[in-house]
Amino acid sequence: MKTRIIQDEPEPEPEAAAPAGADTPVADERETWLRRAFFATAIVGYFVIGVVHPADIEVGDETALYIGIHLVQPVFILLLAWGIWLLVKDLPGRAAQVARIAIVPYAIVYSMFDAIAGVSLGGIVRQANEASAADAATVQRLMDSGTDYVGIVIFVASGLTWFAMAFAAALAVRRIGGLGPTLLMAIGAAIFAVGHPFPPGPIGIALFGLGIAWLELRREAAKAPEAQPVLAP
């Protein structure tokens, strides 16, 4: 008597699920180009602002350029803040943590104190230019008299918040970019903290931008695959 053995067909193996981080390379690439675009726009913009920025403004001076500079400035401030965030948000270490924390004070202080104060001063000078000669002279005497404590506070607060953020970011990227980019960024940050008009402004932001560019080149080179040896036939 023959026995017929029936074998069940093996069930097809379930398809492997896509890894949770499958979209991560695309997201990383998008963030990379956003970071570069933010830095490029802000650095070039601040360089131009520094070159054309009047050293001082007095009654009788043209105010359109001065006011326009300080109206545009908050855009570059926020782009720098966003660029720094994208640069250090995933980096470990105390310096990266300090840079992340310092972003908000920098954005608030530099925007509200420096940019808004510049617009306000330009508006005062414009009103004085439209007033009588006697009133204009009175405004100028008020601007020249005494110590500008408000201006000193704005200058110090703006410079310190920028330097804290940018210098901490420069230290944080040393482990991925090396000493060269860190030095350029740190020196540029220190010079730019003195002020954004010429000469410290353009020089400082240019050095900081060169450090960022050097860092990006090193990061790009680190991502490039190693060349595979070709076997001779």
Give, region by region, the residue ranges found by the protein language model:
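Hydrophobic, aromatic-enriched alpha-helical segments typical of multi-pass transmembrane helices
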Residues: 23-230
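Short, Lys/Arg-rich, polar N-terminal cytosolic tail immediately upstream
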Residues: 1-30
